[in-house]
Amino acid sequence: MKYAEKSPALWDAIRQEEKRQQNTIELIASENIVSDAVREAQGSVLTNKYAEGYPGRRYYGGCQYIDQVEQLAIDYAKKLFNAKFANVQPHSGSQANMAVYQALLKPGDVILGMGMDAGGHLTHGAKVNFSGKEYKSYEYGLNVETEELDFDQIRKVALEVKPKLIVAGASAYSRIIDWQKFRDIADEVGAYLMVDMAHIAGLVATDQHPSPIPVADIVTTTTHKTLRGPRGGMILSNNLEIGKKINSALFPGIQGGPLEHVIAGKAQAFYEDLQPQFTDYIKQVVKNAKAMAEVFDESENIRVVSGGTDNHLMIIDITDTGLTGKDAQNLLDFVNITTNKESIPGDKRSPFITSGLRIGTPAITSRGFNEEDARKTASLIIEILSDPDNEATIEHVKKEVHELTKKHPVE
């Protein structure tokens, strides 16, 4: 059914964004490229349907096919992560986290999460976020020397503040996380353990990172990033009693009608993630990240935080280049390499300026980049950050970026 002509301004902006994605090396760790099937599902007629409630328990009629779609997403998710419970309705990772807090906590309860400058997320207790306003939040950090999780410090803080909930997981941490150590600390202080695996869910699904599902009380994730699905959230658990609380906290607690067209996209993505080639993809994501980290680590003026990576991302300290993270992000944008500024451990600069960059490989790997391409990309970043005012350098890097994007088009 047609109601009106397309907005020329809108579709011009969409075409320009499509062109930008095609011609840019995308290194933002939280971004990826979905399949045509995921886009088709998300753009389907399901966007027309309201479906408050859960499969078999809706407040609206006409949901028989919607129920099938959402149940497929639930079943695929449970199989993918070997979990007994899955809620696929959260509109985002933040709302997934909010639902957990609403289900398990009361306003003013104590939560303990990773500090922002250590690699944590806003929703892990940052003072500017609901999680740091509605709850009494404390933070843990990294070992100053290793720049890895300091479990002695985490235990010490937990014993002091007696949290009701400990949040494990990160948005900018490049090492394997020992979930059992968090579990032991949570048990010692009588806290729930929630794991936010938004960044590493694809690695967990393919056994490239230990799974938190058997260890944590509750696990949240986004469905994009390394899962290569539509933008959205999900909650998983092996505790069915907690699952019941989660369902009620999400709906009717904090959300109304679920976005069933997005849930269809999630179902398609989870189906793709269950195929053997997805494991091959994730393995290549990690190989590409390690290859980039090695190149950065060999440079004279760029340092990889913690000395390397075990997953899909790394944080690079660019202090010795004389540039701020904001400067570097803008400079790289100019040569068609997209990154994001990132605080480094103990960063003295504000989160709007920073002393580092976060680099991730999910999107370039989806385009077909291999280790050689990843090393080349890292070398180009070093070249431009080391010589930012040289027009010849800028033009050379632009040319090389164009060749790489032409070699590996977005398909």
Curated annotation (Swiss-Prot):
Q: What is this protein called?
A: Serine hydroxymethyltransferase
- Which keywords does the record carry? Amino-acid biosynthesis, Cytoplasm, One-carbon metabolism, Pyridoxal phosphate, Transferase
Residues the UniProt record annotates as site (Plays an important role in substrate specificity): 224
Q: What species does this protein belong to?
A: Lactobacillus acidophilus (strain ATCC 700396 / NCK56 / N2 / NCFM)
Tell me, what is an example of a GO biological process annotation in this record?
A: glycine biosynthetic process from serine
Family annotation (NCBIfam families): PRK00011.1
CDD domains the record matches? SHMT
Provide the catalytic activity annotation.
Answer: (6R)-5,10-methylene-5,6,7,8-tetrahydrofolate + glycine + H2O = (6S)-5,6,7,8-tetrahydrofolate + L-serine
Q: What are the recorded GO MF terms, alphabetically?
A: glycine hydroxymethyltransferase activity; pyridoxal phosphate binding
Q: Look up the record and name the cofactor or cofactors this protein needs.
A: pyridoxal 5'-phosphate
Q: Which PANTHER family match?
A: SERINE HYDROXYMETHYLTRANSFERASE, SERINE HYDROXYMETHYLTRANSFERASE 1
Give the highest taxon in the source lineage.
Bacteria
Q: Name the HAMAP family on file.
A: SHMT
Provide one Gene Ontology cellular component.
Answer: cytosol
Classification lineage:
Bacteria, Bacillati, Bacillota, Bacilli, Lactobacillales
Q: In which pathway does it act?
A: One-carbon metabolism; tetrahydrofolate interconversion; Amino-acid biosynthesis; glycine biosynthesis; glycine from L-serine: step 1/1
* Name of the coding gene: glyA
Q: What is its EC number?
A: 2.1.2.1
N6-(pyridoxal phosphate)lysine occurs at which residues?
A: 225
Binding sites annotated in the UniProt record for (6S)-5,6,7,8-tetrahydrofolate: 120-122, 350-352
Localization, per the record, is: Cytoplasm
Sum up the protein's function in the record's words.
Answer: Catalyzes the reversible interconversion of serine and glycine with tetrahydrofolate (THF) serving as the one-carbon carrier. This reaction serves as the major source of one-carbon groups required for the biosynthesis of purines, thymidylate, methionine, and other important biomolecules. Also exhibits THF-independent aldolase activity toward beta-hydroxyamino acids, producing glycine and aldehydes, via a retro-aldol mechanism.
Assembly behavior: Homodimer.
Signal sequence annotation: none
Could you tell me which InterPro entries the record lists for this protein? PyrdxlP-dep_Trfase, PyrdxlP-dep_Trfase_major, PyrdxlP-dep_Trfase_small, Ser_HO-MeTrfase, Ser_HO-MeTrfase-like, Ser_HO-MeTrfase_PLP_BS, SHMT-like_dom
- What does the sequence similarity comment in the record state about its family? Belongs to the SHMT family.
- Coarsely, its chief localization is cytoplasm
